[in-house]
């Protein structure tokens, strides 16, 4: 019971003396490991505390009317925010800081321009799913040269996924895979 209470306290939001909330920030989490086609694959993900002064941000705005609203969500560095209720995240909220994929001895880091708009990444239990539910899924090509990460993010009404594909040749994208047409 003490361990349960201690764990709950660690996950709780902390409020500083100045009223600013602080969240636990996890770094260098080994998110997934496997060996495919004799290549060791390791995905390492880190969070960072969001600092809006280091990004170009926009607030949500209603581009419609009061009778017929058309809300456009907040953006960070020109991309829609993922992991919040379309609102601009508060300072200190866990932001996806970096993704590094190891293909054997080669490391490929996803550019910050692809991660800066992603908040509250789910860095627990990747690859754990059942017939109905999946949080985060990692897929690796049969030749071990490409990793796809479908990362669960957010909480409550802001829950979503952020997709990343990383290849051993150093390229990264947020574009989901295309299926060949018949």
Model-derived segments and their meaning:
Residues 3-13:
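Sec-dependent N-terminal signal peptides
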